[in-house]
Amino acid sequence: LARLVEDPSLIDSAVEEILRFTSPVIHFMRTAVADFEIGGKTIREGESVSLWYPSANRDEEVFDRPYEFDIGRNPNPHLAFGGYGPHFCIGAHLARTQLRAVFGQLLPILPKLEVAGDLVRMKNLHVGGYTALPVRAREGVALAS
């Protein structure tokens, strides 16, 4: 966080790392329309296949230090929005824009905030996120300028 506050030019790469590390989509299932082989395993037509995005976004063959949160990670070929192609999330650009806007506005006051309670995660097997992230101004700090 201190690095981002110190260098706001990292907002874009920080947004991508947040998406990789938190994987808003947990998993999707598909049905094979033909037999195929992947990783030495044969998948038969009609069988279900599931992609677990948090696992894919920590693939040690793709990411150096995959369990480390690094806002300077480059390249960052995460699959947070379903990868690429016809199943790519139509809201991906909006989500990225919203995250950039939020961080652009919060960066000046982030050092003045502290966590004020437990983070509450969504209870959902398909999408991830938080329903509550309570924060407050640090003692003796005024947020208004």
Model-found features: residue ranges?
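Cytochrome P450
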Residues: 1-145
